[in-house]
Regions:
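Cysteine-centered nucleophilic/redox motifs
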Residues: 96, 318, 326-341
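Glycine- and acidic-residue-enriched helix-capping/beta->alpha junction motif
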Residues: 237-302, 338
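BRCT (BRCA1 C-terminal) domain core and associated BRCT-interaction motifs
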Residues: 345-400
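Short, conserved helix/loop micro-motifs enriched in His/Cys and acidic residues
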Residues: 307-321
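Flexible, low-complexity junctional segments that flank or bridge functional domains
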Residues: 1-245, 249-253, 258, 262-265, ...
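Extracytoplasmic/peripheral linker and loop segments enriched in polar/acidic and small residues
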Residues: 67-75, 79, 309-310, 387-410
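Active-site-proximal beta-strand/loop segments in catalytic clefts of secreted hydrolases
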Residues: 217-221, 248-252, 278-282, 321-325, ...
Length: 410
């Protein structure tokens, strides 16, 4: 295909229609062939290269030669194939482009997918410690504990001991143990992945109220219902009268950032959206968004920041619960919330997906593989794969109860 043919093909199914289907829960996948010829697979790869170069917001963050080398290697490897399945094609592409770190960018079919993300997991031991000046002590034996720089301490809540910590490590590879010195002797501590709330049925909002505390749970922000946004605003407004508001965002992978923004507007009166957002503009992005072919030079435009001041109508304390299934626009909400006074975060690290976002859907012509392609850059200060770290790390499946117990002691 020529560049014009690529544009015309991409414009046939604009995001104005696909986004509506996705938000309504409709299936956006097409039937993929069982196998592809090497020629058809190579044609898909060349279309993918065109999309990367003209519509992927993360493309300019890497050296172009890396992409050129990777795509040349993919095409060369396909020449040795008589037939290849769509799933195999996905894996060949992802393995050659493994230098990319992007949790949104992905290639999928209806029953298979692969991407460009490897989470920095948190592993902790069962040994709680506390800190006195610059030294750490075992909370049970009271003996001093020494460890090297690879081992981290994670502030936690302990109603009986101040300045308490979990000890462990953050790693992209499974880690089963760490070595420490306790009372001058070497000791090996088993590690486990930090506990977090188990997945439950997704819902936009659930609310309950206990004396001076409001508990608001939002496990999904998918959709675009103005009525639902208004509901979140009214719930936020209702919460102003409470001394404590617990906002449980566990397992919320994101969706539409207007949902959390409406809750915060209701609670505080306004949200200072100071996160810098860069929108990629190009002929391909325009064609995919609108279905219109138009010559637009490749460039980034910064979205305007309005308003520039947070509201102050809530005078209580906001307690936000997060875990390693919090991502994308929900992480954006964490950055907004962190700009208010008297806000504390509990749980564990967020997923760290969202630096590149606002997804467009592209179909590779022959395989019908779906490319989920970010077209914006969100500079929220949350590093991809690292995530947002809480003020207090809670090794529990029920962080809400831990936080409520903590609040009751205030």
């Amino acid at each position: 295909m020529s560049n014009l043919e690529y544009l015309e093909y991409s414009a046939k199914e604009p995001m104005t229609l696909l986004r509506k289907k996705f938000n309504n829960g409709e299936d956006i996948y097409k039937t993929s062939p069982t196998t592809l010829t090497a020629e058809d697979a190579s044609a898909d790869v060349m279309y993918l290269k065109y999309v990367f170069e003209n519509a992927y917001s993360g493309f300019s963050y890497y050296d172009k030669s890396l992409f050129d080398t990777a795509f040349a290697a993919i095409v060369k490897s396909l020449k040795d194939s008589v037939q290849i399945t769509p799933d195999q094609l996905i894996d060949v592409i992802c393995s050659n482009l493994s230098f990319i770190t992007d949790g949104h960018l992905a290639l999928t079919t209806a029953d298979y997918g692969n991407g460009f993300y490897k989470e920095l997991q948190t592993y902790v031991s069962d040994m709680p410690v506390y800190k006195v000046r610059d030294a750490y002590y075992d909370a049970k034996t009271k003996k001093q504990v020494l460890f090297d720089d690879a081992v981290r301490t994670f502030p936690t809540l302990n109603n009986s001991i101040a300045d308490s910590y979990l000890i462990g490590i953050r790693s992209k590879n499974p880690t089963e143990k760490i070595s420490v010195k306790s009372d001058g002797k070497d000791e090996v501590l088993p590690l486990h992945r930090i506990m977090s709330k188990e997945q439950t049925e997704e819902s936009l909002v659930e609310e309950r109220y206990e004396e001076n505390t409001a508990i608001i749970t939002c496990s999904s922000f998918v959709g675009d219902s103005e009525e639902a946004m208004k509901k979140l605003y009214e719930i936020g407004k209702k919460c102003r009268k409470y001394r404590h508001v617990v906002w449980d965002l566990s397992n919320n992978l994101g969706g539409n950032s207007e949902f959390p923004k409406h809750f915060l507007k209701g609670l505080y009166g306004d949200v200072a959206d100071t996160v810098k957002v860069l929108e990629l503009q190009s002929s391909l992005v325009h064609a995919k968004e609108t279905g219109e072919i138009k010559d637009i030079p490749y460039h980034f435009e910064e979205s305007p920041h309005t308003p520039t001041k947070n509201g102050d109508l809530f005078t209580g304390e906001l307690h936000i619960i997060i875990n390693d299934m919090v991502a994308s626009s929900t992480e954006l909400a964490l950055r907004w919330a962190a700009s208010y006074p008297r806000v504390t975060f509990y749980g564990c690290n967020s997923l760290g997906i969202g630096h590149f976002g606002d997804l467009c859907i592209y179909y590779l012509p022959n395989s019908q593989i779906v490319l989920w392609c970010p077209q914006k850059v969100f500079d929220a200060g949350i590093q991809e794969t690292v995530g947002f770290e809480p003020d207090f790390w809670i090794d529990s499946y029920d962080v809400v109860s831990t936080v409520l117990n903590h609040i009751s002691t205030k």
